[in-house]
Amino acid sequence: MAQKLNLLNLAVPPVTHRSNFPSTFTFGVATSAYQIEGGWNEGKKGPSIWDKFTHIEGKILDGSNGDVAVDHYHRYKEDVDLIGQLGFGAYRFSISWSRIFPDGLGTEVNEEGIAFYNDLINTLLEKGIQPYVTLYHWDLPSHLQEAIGGWTNRKIVDYFGLYADACFANFGDRVKHWITLNEPLQTSVNGHCIGIFAPGRNEKPLIEPYLVSHHQVLAHATAVSIYRSKYKESQGGQIGLSVDCEWAEPNSEKPEDKVAADRRIDFQLGWFLDPLFFGDYPASMRQKLGDNLPRFTPEEKEFMLQNSWDFLGLNHYTSRLISHVSNKEAESNFYQAQELERIVELENGDLIGERAASDWLYAVPWGIRKTLNYMSKKYNHPPIFITENGMDDEDDGSASIHDMLDDKRRVDYFKSYLANVSQAIEDGVDIKGYFAWSLLDNFEWAQGYTKRFGLVYVDYKNGLTRHPKSSAYWFMKFLKGDEENKGKKE
């Protein structure tokens, strides 16, 4: 029975040490520009769609915004010091498009924006920390949204190419790992179907999400083409994209549940990776969506296949059990089309895993191993970086700072997920690195500052001071190789 299978999957793996990972394995922390930078209108930066969206009353749970965020724009040297003190060898951050091109068009290059990221990159390298740079983490220049409709317009592909080119030209001599897009699914679904993320569109939920994803895939391939033709030989870097996936486990042995679970993954990973690897969307998506799913020309297919990726980034937090259902009202058109139910409760009443603060996040450590194995098998054993993994605590104002700093559940989460990552390596998956989300507590999109994902606590009431949590100290010990393993030599 699948029920027994699920319970077997929950077996606690052996304790994991730094020595369970290759010596060349990269450990880092991750952030994104809008969530941490602040300085929203400083240094000649143009407004982004998230600047505009958060300034609309009622869009963010606690009425907050990222105008200041955690003020990384002014405190980046302090934050880089923290990364170094904790022992991480890499830092994944994103560049704000409108800090480089204020209007998004490339008609004006903002030298102050270039200088900021140059200084950040140089500060990292001085500390021996490698920069992993995301070009697009959701903060589209608002002028592109207002002037051409943003990602719904095919012209966005060329504008993204111009922006990527400028970043490669200015930073690529020192940046050796580029990520074109972060979680393009979220831009498509939460931005253009459900409407809870900027630009907040839900007027055409059957059309726009798939148009937006279509253009994102082509934009990725365009950036890869530019990098490979103009920069790769001289700069020697690599380029990929980061996709998000909750693992989908069939809720029973029924064939229809197994097919539904496969379909659920097609609507996550396959949506963006299949066109780049196979030349088209998954058949299950075409079957469910019909003509609402755009078609690639033969020339575009060839272009995508030639400009896919050097590595894949996986953002993974949680998993679900999947049952096939037909004609059941779902939370959005996107889920309605998939004809399935995402389940968190086992037949015996137990949850699939312990829930974190966010209602979508349950700790299901075996799911990351299954996701990694799936990606490796389907896409011919690509190098994979886990570019985000972590969990959040609630901040409703009731807990003391002392309690917030002693984040035992986060430590347990990282221990169990890292154990499954090391097992995936033993399975033969080519995993190159792991980035914890996140370095700092920060602006958690529609949830504002009510959710805390950081290894480092940010005191929003007292000058945004930084205080490492227990999880930060755990990682520091782990990276030194002596977590629960005193005195053992690497």
UniProtKB/Swiss-Prot annotation:
It comes from the Eukaryota. The keyword Membrane does not apply. Its EC number is 3.2.1.21. PROSITE patterns: GLYCOSYL_HYDROL_F1_2 (PS00653). Expressed at low levels predominantly in root epidermal cells. A beta-D-glucoside binds at residues 35, 137, 182-183, 317, 388, 437, 444-445, 453. The active site is at 183 (proton donor), 388 (nucleophile). Induction: Accumulates upon rhizobacteria-mediated (e.g. P.fluorescens WCS417r) induced systemic resistance (ISR) in root trichoblasts and, to a lesser extent, in cortical cells. Belongs to the glycosyl hydrolase 1 family. This is Beta-glucosidase 42. It comes from Arabidopsis thaliana (Mouse-ear cress). The lineage of its organism: Eukaryota, Viridiplantae, Streptophyta, Embryophyta, Tracheophyta.
